[in-house]
């Protein structure tokens, strides 16, 4: 019997009509809150490093300049006292770290996912795809499998597990979810980024100041979004449309940010020129993303930028002459949570849509229609996502 449909007809039936859309956002942190003003004393005490007075003063200056007010960490004083090797600089401790993150990464991801699913308001059986991202540990079956079981998702949900990507990956997961949603009619993609610093926490050492930068910046957090095309406006509330997404490796940036999984945990290596490398290339990324739209004024778009640290934000602002309010949501999340790696940009997206409603703006993007989301991380890799906001009057806020 001859086929009644062509391949082209099958493909057209499989594709969505409209762009991928963020339909819900949820975030979660551990209960343990650490205030930055107190952290240097705590960190040098718990790592038994108070004798390193000069290094402690350097660390205090790092924390003072970080623009971070507080962070959340699963690692408590009690956990660290039970695992002294995690407090050393070079002691073998990977097994202890793995035992923690294998359990806690999916658990924190579940808390964020439950909030997103509640806001979405649809049955979990409608989730067709799961994208899970973490830089915290590796395991088989992965955190995607664990979360599928925890949430009671269908066993046939199509899963993608992303381990060890780093800070740019909040953009990566949106790019992947966009492709999944737009190429699978009716797809609803649950995206989860969950990060626990138990894999990177370690004691100080005079020869490794870039490791101290990480100790001053990193915090724990998980964020989840639900993404789908062609939303059913009778039951779903769009928040942002994902218009385009791209990834690039910056020229002459090899070795600028590295992470290596070793017996001592995930070690962090950073070159001083990271803010310069990013700011030098930011305008090109913006031009390539917005030229098709005829946009070349960077204060006319809303900004969601991975808050790798204040120096990166300062130099990007200076390079493209940004008004201070453009980075308000980004700097707020930096202040209140620190650097949560892949989860950061989703926290910022959540902050932006909530504050836009509170401040009486017309759209979820601080009153503007178009926006940009940047992920920066190892490579140096940059993810660029062009967003379109939706009118708040359409019920687009949580």
UniProtKB/Swiss-Prot annotation:
Catalytic activity: (E)-4-coumaroyl-CoA + 3 malonyl-CoA + 3 H(+) = 2',4,4',6'-tetrahydroxychalcone + 3 CO2 + 4 CoA
UniProt KW keywords: Acyltransferase, Flavonoid biosynthesis, Transferase
Pathway: Secondary metabolite biosynthesis; flavonoid biosynthesis
Pfam families: Chal_sti_synt_C (PF02797), Chal_sti_synt_N (PF00195)
A molecular-function term among this protein's GO annotations: naringenin-chalcone synthase activity
Purpose: The primary product of this enzyme is 4,2',4',6'-tetrahydroxychalcone (also termed naringenin-chalcone or chalcone) which can under specific conditions spontaneously isomerize into naringenin.
Full protein name: Chalcone synthase 1
Naturally occurring in which organism (per UniProt): Hordeum vulgare
Gene symbol of the encoding locus: CHS1
């Amino acid at each position: 019997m001859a086929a009644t449909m062509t391949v082209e007809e099958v493909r057209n039936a499989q594709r969505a009509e409209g762009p991928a859309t963020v339909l819900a956002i949820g975030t979660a942190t551990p209960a343990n809150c650490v205030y930055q003003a107190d952290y240097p004393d705590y960190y040098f005490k718990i790592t038994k490093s108070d004798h390193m007075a000069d290094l402690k003063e350097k660390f205090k200056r790092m924390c003072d300049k970080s623009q971070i007010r507080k962070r959340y960490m699963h690692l408590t004083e009690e956990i660290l006292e039970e695992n002294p090797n995690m407090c050393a600089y070079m002691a073998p401790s990977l097994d202890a770290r793995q035992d923690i993150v294998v359990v806690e990464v999916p658990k924190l991801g579940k808390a964020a996912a439950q909030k997103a699913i509640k806001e979405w308001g649809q049955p979990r059986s409608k989730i067709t795809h799961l994208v899970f991202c973490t830089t915290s540990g590796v395991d088989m079956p992965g955190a995607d499998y664990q979360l599928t079981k925890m949430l009671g998702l269908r066993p046939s949900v199509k899963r993608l597990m992303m381990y060890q990507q780093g800070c740019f990956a909040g953009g990566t997961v949106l790019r992947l979810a966009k492709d999944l949603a737009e190429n699978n009619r009716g797809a609803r993609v649950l995206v989860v980024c969950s990060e626990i610093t138990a894999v990177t926490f370690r004691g100080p050492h005079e020869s490794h100041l870039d490791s101290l930068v990480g100790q001053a910046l990193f915090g724990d957090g998980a964020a989840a979004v639900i993404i789908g095309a062609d939303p059913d406006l009778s039951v779903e509330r769009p928040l942002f449309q994902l218009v385009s997404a791209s990834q690039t490796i910056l020229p002459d940036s090899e070795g600028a940010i590295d992470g290596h999984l070793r017996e001592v945990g995930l070690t962090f290596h950073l070159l001083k020129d990271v803010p310069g490398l990013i700011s030098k290339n930011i305008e090109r990324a913006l031009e390539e993303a917005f030229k098709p739209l005829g946009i070349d004024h960077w204060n006319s778009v809303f900004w969601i930028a991975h808050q790798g640290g204040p120096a990166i934000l300062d130099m990007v602002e200076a390079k493209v002459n940004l008004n201070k309010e453009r980075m308000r949501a980004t700097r707020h999340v930096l202040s209140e949570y620190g650097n949560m790696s892949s989860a950061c940009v989703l926290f910022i997206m959540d902050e932006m849509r909530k504050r836009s409603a509170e401040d009486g703006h017309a759209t979820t993007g601080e009153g503007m229609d178009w926006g940009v989301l940047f992920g920066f991380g190892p490579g140096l890799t940059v993810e660029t996502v062009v967003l379109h906001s939706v009118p708040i009057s359409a019920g687009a806020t949580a």
